[in-house]
From Swiss-Prot:
Residues 154-244 are annotated as: Interaction with gE. This is Tegument protein VP22. Keywords: Host cytoplasm, Host Golgi apparatus, Host nucleus, Host-virus interaction, Inhibition of host innate immune response by virus, Phosphoprotein, Viral immunoevasion, Virion, Virion tegument. It comes from Varicella-zoster virus (strain Oka vaccine) (HHV-3). Pfam families: Herpes_UL49_2 (PF04823). Residues 157-167 have a biased composition (Polar residues). Belongs to the alphaherpesvirinae VP22 tegument protein family. InterPro entries: Herpes_UL49 (IPR006908). Tegument protein that plays different roles during the time course of infection. Participates in both the accumulation of viral mRNAs and viral protein translation at late time of infection. Modulates the RNase activity of the virion host shutoff protein ORF17 probably to ensure necessary levels of key cellular mRNAs and proteins. Plays a role in microtubule reorganization that occurs after viral infection by stabilizing microtubule network.
Length: 302
């Protein structure tokens, strides 16, 4: 009976001295707790002292376990700055704090995905399909057809490129040509209005508000345009500041695209209407041959 008590006492002391590695990689003293075992007739029924923990061996294999553990002795290095032997309780605090932080994170994620407007959604680096990507609110919009060519400052021209070789104009081509046509009319109108205003002002400069009103009433420009390539040429020359050649060429023609007014009358732009539908179609298209022909005519007139 004495031997069994001695074995239990040795086992208790050995377990009390056992150290377990902490989360930081250093050894700490295991926490001790009293467990009352089953009553025994050989002792005073106070039980024995052991340790409850994950690394604690069962009482049956305790002797073999500690005999193996004692082959590699370990040096106890307390990690508690207070110097107490039992410093394993702070691990419970760390685990509790970790669980609390994880719970808060899960609650935030649930709130985000249940109500995206309440909390800002975390940005995702990529998506499987590019079409699923949300559009940026401040992303620049695509310019309408023809706006880029007009804003670039290059000479404008109609587009004659159909979608296929045999089909009629389709896709963005009509919108492009409409915008180019309106821009050409605007430039020609601005050039004519400038010349008419200068002529009216030079003929009789206004000296008061009443004369200015009469001048503005008489200087109203009635805008008409000439068809096809002449409109684009006039618009490009007006944009490049070569309106003098346009007016000179207009006076030399029989009908005259641009005619000067007599006296105080402003200059008006007159139009030569096409005779048939085929003329409209042929004049509306611009080719390299027509450009070369118009350039040769201009050189011959000069």
């Amino acid at each position: 009976m004495a031997s069994s008590d001695g074995d239990r006492l040795c086992r208790s002391n050995a377990v009390r001295r056992k150290t377990t590695p902490s989360y930081s990689g250093q050894y700490r003293t295991a926490r001790r707790s009293v467990v009352v075992g089953p009553p025994d007739d050989s002792d005073d029924s106070l039980g024995y002292i052991t340790t409850v923990g994950a690394d604690s061996p069962s009482p049956v294999y305790a002797d073999l376990y500690f005999e193996h553990k004692n082959t590699t002795p370990r040096v106890h290095q307390p990690n508690d700055s207070s110097g107490s032997e039992d410093d394993f309780e702070d691990i419970d605090e760390v685990v509790a704090a970790f669980r609390e932080a994880r719970l808060r994170h899960e609650l935030v994620e649930d709130a985000v995905y249940e109500n995206p407007l309440s909390v800002e959604k975390p940005s995702r680096s990529f998506t499987k399909n590019a079409a699923v990507k949300p559009k940026l609110e401040d992303s620049p919009k695509r310019a309408p057809p023809g706006a880029g060519a007009i804003a670039s400052g290059r000479p404008i021209s109609f587009s004659t490129a159909p979608k296929t070789a045999t089909s009629s104009w389709c896709g963005p081509t009509p919108s492009y040509n409409k915008r180019v046509f309106c821009e050409a009319v605007r430039r020609v109108a601005a050039m004519q209005a400038q010349k008419a205003a200068e002529a009216a002002w030079n003929s009789n400069p206004p000296r008061n508000n009443a004369e200015l009103d009469r001048l503005l009433t008489g200087a109203v420009i009635r805008i008409t345009v000439h068809e096809g390539l002449n409109l684009i040429q006039a618009a490009n020359e007006a944009d490049l500041g070569e309106g003098a050649s346009v007016s000179k060429r207009g006076h030399n023609r029989k009908t005259g695209d641009l005619q000067g007014g007599m006296g105080n009358e402003p200059m008006y732009a007159q139009v030569r209407k096409p005779k048939s539908r085929t003329d409209t179609q042929t004049t509306g298209r611009i080719t390299n041959r027509s450009r070369a022909r118009s350039a040769s005519r201009t050189d011959a007139r000069k």
